[in-house]
């Protein structure tokens, strides 16, 4: 039994932080940012009283409405995020409360930018095993809460937002989440993309705050090299494992980190520009939110049809990376 995606949804906050705004804050300019990243603006959840659970709640309500489902019908909620409201309880538990899904158990999963694919794979297993019938998977991050807006190497990249899907048993033979490849390399990744403060190694103190340890640190050059290679490799691997070609892949749905990485992945796959989705110019990198936001936009624009072949791929901190093959139901 395969797991099929039966609903999609996204939420982007109204606040916009443009490249021109960043010009006034940092030693940077619009042309420099667009040339290196492809990003023109990003969304920001400005209300300090609203956190990642708010984004997830908005996504969850839409998913239920689109599917015509009651919250009580859900068996499981998985939230992929690296910016939870709190260390505990999990953001997924907060979402369960927000939507009133009293019969669902819930947990968070943190694989940074790869989080949604890891969560999608995990949720699919519960459907495939027959343990559950209705699983909600959400990827969301309030990245503005962990960005140092005096550091142009990271401030230009990230935005807030999220998206999600509902998984149910496929009703069409040969459709659903059909294959995946997930990878991790803690040896290479542990020093190049991280946030040092706030965990048990460096608990929050005046010193950790003064030292900016509660913000993302990224060695941009090293991360870029690894991301370009890993995302392209896993996307090609998914194609080869499943007999897919550039002609019969309907959509490449890549993590939206950087337009150059997206384009390099498509080029390795032989995919033309009309077969991959890119919204990084409008939203920046929403981390765990990028791929489900892309899926929701494709769905809203009626670009997903029964039998469409989708290759999803991502790369994130850890390092973590992966690819998923979905045949749309």
Swiss-Prot record:
GO terms for cellular component: cytoplasm. Pathway: Lipid metabolism; fatty acid biosynthesis. GO terms for molecular function: 3-oxoacyl-[acyl-carrier-protein] synthase activity; beta-ketoacyl-acyl-carrier-protein synthase III activity. It catalyses: malonyl-[ACP] + acetyl-CoA + H(+) = 3-oxobutanoyl-[ACP] + CO2 + CoA. It holds the Pfam family ACP_syn_III_C. Disulfide bonds: none annotated. It comes from the Bacteria. It is found in: Cytoplasm. The last Arg residue of the ACP-binding site is essential for the weak association between ACP/AcpP and FabH. NCBIfam families: fabH, PRK09352.1. Belongs to the thiolase-like superfamily. FabH family. Catalyzes the condensation reaction of fatty acid synthesis by the addition to an acyl acceptor of two carbons from malonyl-ACP. Catalyzes the first condensation reaction which initiates fatty acid synthesis and may therefore play a role in governing the total rate of fatty acid production. Possesses both acetoacetyl-ACP synthase and acetyl transacylase activities. Its substrate specificity determines the biosynthesis of branched-chain and/or straight-chain of fatty acids. This is Beta-ketoacyl-[acyl-carrier-protein] synthase III.
């Amino acid at each position: 039994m395969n797991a099929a995606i039966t609903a999609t949804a996204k939420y982007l906050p109204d606040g916009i932080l443009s490249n021109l705004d960043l010009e006034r804050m940092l030693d940077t300019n619009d042309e420099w940012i667009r040339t290196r990243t492809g990003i023109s603006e990003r969304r920001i959840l400005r209300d300090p009283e609203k956190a990642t659970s708010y984004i997830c709640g908005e996504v969850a309500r839409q998913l239920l409405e689109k599917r015509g489902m009651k919250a009580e019908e859900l068996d499981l909620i998985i939230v992929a995020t690296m910016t939870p409201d709190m260390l505990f309880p999990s953001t997924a538990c907060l979402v369960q409360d927000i939507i009133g899904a009293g019969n669902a158990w819930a947990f968070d999963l943190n694989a940074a930018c790869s989080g949604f694919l890891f969560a999608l794979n995990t949720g699919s297993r519960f459907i495939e095993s027959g343990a559950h019938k209705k699983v909600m998977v959400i990827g969301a991050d309030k990245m503005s809460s962990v960005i140092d807006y005096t550091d142009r190497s990271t401030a230009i990249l990230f935005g807030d937002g999220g998206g999600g899907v509902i998984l149910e048993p496929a009703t069409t033979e040969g459709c659903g989440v059909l294959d995946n490849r997930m990878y991790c390399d803690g040896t290479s990744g542990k020093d190049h993309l991280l946030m040092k403060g706030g965990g048990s190694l460096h608990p929050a103190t005046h010193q950790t705050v003064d030292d900016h340890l509660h913000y993302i640190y990224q060695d941009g050059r090293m991360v870029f090299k690894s991301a370009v290679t890993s995302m392209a490799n896993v996307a090609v691997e998914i194609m080869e494992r499943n007999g897919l070609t550039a002609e019969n892949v309907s959509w490449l749905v890549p993590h939206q980190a950087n337009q150059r990485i997206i384009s390099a992945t498509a080029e390795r796959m032989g995919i033309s520009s009309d077969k991959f989705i890119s919204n990084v110019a409008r939203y920046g990198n929403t981390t765990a939110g990028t791929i489900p936001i892309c899926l929701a936009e494709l769905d809203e624009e009626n670009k997903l049809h029964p039998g469409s072949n989708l290759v999803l791929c991502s790369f994130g901190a850890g390092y973590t990376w992966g690819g998923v093959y979905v045949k749309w139901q």
